[in-house]
């Protein structure tokens, strides 16, 4: 037991080392002279982590711990093998060039490793504290504080940021409100914007859901307490298959965001003004689906670069609506459609009515349709000779009206200057 406890303390020590490496790597710029020794340090750290995890795997007495450690080992082996392949493929180049090539692989792998370890830590919190409400609120508070300090790192902003502004931005990102006190596009670097989008993603899905997503793969170690916490967060009716439900939420969310990013990319691929097009697409896909409203463009969607890109705006609207409805409503509706289609072509039950869609789904869908259609018609009529004059086509006017009807559902985006709108 003492040996197991010592290994756990060493595990936490290595977690701190990994965290420090990540923070200093992304948060500070030490110049070119530091790059090569830094990459060598990342390689040695990865080798050290692999050695320690291997030792823990063969000395651990708990089967559940072995599953977690095995995943860590596989991840570290993949990182090092990829580094080795890159080294062999570029062996004719200088060592400095090769080290710069493998640096992103090491950084990305160690970040993923740390996230896995963070999920284990959160699950440990579940076990020692039972109150789901406290765990829920506490996870958001911790996420906001961590995000605030990360946004204050030198490489996260162009000219620095106060703690108050960092705290406000982090809170807005985690709570997906879209409110900002600084310009996300101007005052934050790509590092800062990446921190913001991670906060949006964790806040939108919930760190508890992400934790349960990983727990699905280690089901022998998932606890009754953890099941209760997860059930409350994802609004699941019971404890049966609660971790599978969390898995479905995460996979559905990430899948929709990836597809949305691809469609957004197709809408801006010919736009020479927008840099880092796939990053732009992924950022706005996550921001739209989570109803956050953050943008990497100065002025947001009101920017002339995309203000008249109606294809982009319809994609964002669809993402906002899907994210705003929530996974329970979307899952129930798709289950209804699937069952209806199956029974439609099944001659044995062709006259049987499908009664799967819930009352909650009906209320939400009908209310959403009424608000969106009614809002679009009202804005089209009331703003036709005011803000809609800048749109030359009827389709453009309809798109602008629909976008302004959709975004008030906590999305935060805006393609119209509200100060110019009629009373």
Regions found by a protein language model. Name each.
Residues 1-423:
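Membrane-proximal intracellular helices of multi-pass ion channels
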């Amino acid at each position: 037991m003492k040996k197991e406890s010592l290994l756990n303390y060493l595990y936490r020590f290595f977690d701190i080392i990994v965290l420090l490496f990540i923070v200093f790597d992304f948060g500070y710029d030490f110049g070119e002279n530091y790059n090569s020794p830094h990459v060598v340090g990342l390689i040695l750290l990865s080798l050290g982590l692999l050695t320690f995890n291997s030792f823990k795997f063969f000395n651990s007495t708990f089967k559940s711990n072995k599953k977690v450690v095995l995943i860590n080992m596989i991840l570290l082996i993949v990182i090092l093998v990829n580094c080795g392949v890159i080294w062999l493929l570029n062996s004719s180049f200088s060592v400095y060039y090769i080290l710069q090539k493998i640096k992103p692989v090491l950084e990305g792998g160690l970040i993923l490793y740390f996230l896995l370890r963070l999920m284990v830590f959160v699950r440990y919190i579940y076990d020692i504290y039972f109150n789901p409400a406290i765990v829920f609120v506490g996870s958001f508070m911790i996420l906001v504080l961590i995000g605030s300090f990360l946004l204050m790192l030198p490489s996260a902003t162009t000219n620095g940021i106060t703690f108050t502004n960092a705290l406000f931005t982090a809170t807005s990102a985690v709570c997906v409100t879209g409110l900002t006190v600084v310009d996300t596009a101007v005052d934050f670097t790509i590092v800062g914007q990446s921190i913001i989008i991670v906060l949006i993603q964790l806040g939108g899905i919930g760190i508890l859901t992400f934790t349960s997503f990983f727990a699905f793969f280690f089901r022998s170690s998932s606890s009754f307490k953890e099941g209760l916490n997860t059930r409350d967060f994802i609004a699941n009716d019971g404890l049966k298959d609660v971790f599978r439900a969390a898995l479905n939420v995460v996979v559905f969310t990430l899948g929709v965001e990836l597809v949305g990013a691809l469609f957004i990319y197709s809408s801006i691929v010919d736009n020479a003004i927008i840099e880092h097009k796939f990053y732009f697409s992924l950022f706005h896909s996550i921001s739209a689906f989570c109803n956050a409203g953050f943008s990497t463009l100065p002025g947001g969607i009101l920017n002339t670069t995309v203000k008249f890109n109606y294809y982009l705006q319809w994609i964002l609207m669809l993402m906002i609506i899907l994210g705003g409805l929530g996974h329970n409503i979307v899952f129930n509706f798709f289950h209804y459609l699937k069952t209806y289609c199956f029974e439609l072509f099944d001659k044995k039950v062709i006259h049987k009515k499908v009664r799967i869609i819930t009352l909650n789904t009906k209320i939400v869908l009908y209310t959403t349709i009424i608000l969106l259609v009614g809002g679009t018609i009202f804005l089209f009529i009331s703003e036709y000779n005011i803000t809609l004059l800048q749109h030359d086509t009827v389709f453009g006017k309809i798109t602008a009206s629909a976008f302004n009807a959709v975004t008030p559902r906590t999305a935060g985006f805006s393609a119209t200057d509200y100060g110019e709108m009629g009373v």
